């Protein structure tokens, strides 16, 4: 696939062509978050509270995967823009190796620490038990999640946003379909309750990764995973983490905020924790479209910076900043319009 269009195509049409597929997939993903909460709420109030308590940990795991993926994406795009394909391959390969290490560590830590973590916010044995059951299944798919995010960022780095859109949407749609089937038990499927919600999510994430792998092998892209680059290079590792760590912290800090708020609210009522969890799920419906635009921007910034097109970098940044601001203002207006009258 020829990626020179990232420095040749007019800026606004380029941003729209890169961002709109991601905006659409992010909207579907945010819709899933709301639907998932709706079905879990049908189980019991305790199940919804458990999901709200597990949510910041899930968000932290996603932050590590996505944040480091941003580093992979930026480094690959930079080297492609500079015309150094070998370095781009090295960044992709070593980024994948490091992401897999992150996945294994997060899986072990998440599953082993969850009972103690839940006990910090509630004394209800039912809520803790439901939270542990959900998290054991959900966190078992952590390695699949981080590898999937890595391939997502690799495809985005070469400008292949359609594959990313299709993969994410297919994963979300199968998730939405399987949620009621596995939670309540339809046809040959047993009733699994909150564990069914976790399994449905895991199956959706597995499908997303499977699509990436099929496309990668059937329709090769410009960047390749190469055995010769598996051994980690100190320079490349530093470059990946120098971008990945700040991005991870930026995404992970809200998880710490939610956990702190949960600890405060737990002193009053578990219902408050439930309401806060629902609010953050609804908030993503506004935030994720803006995030989709930013995801479309990242490879463009990296590619043009690597190619020395500093003027285009500035143009891209300013246009995306305006587009994101417009979405946030519209979201704020929508919230005020929908506020119930007292």
Range-by-range predicted roles:
Residues 27, 31-49, 118-125, 181-192, ...:
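Helix-terminus/linker motif at the lipid-water interface of multi-pass membrane proteins
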Residues 222-254, 261-267, 272-276:
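Acidic, glycine-rich loop-and-beta core segments that form the ion-binding/anion-interacting portion
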Residues 23, 27, 31, 35, ...:
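Generic alpha-helical transmembrane segments of integral inner-membrane proteins
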Residues 1-19, 76-143, 189-245, 301-342:
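Short alpha-helical transmembrane segments in multi-pass integral membrane proteins
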Residues 48-108, 145-164, 262, 276-334:
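Small-residue-rich hydrophobic transmembrane alpha-helices
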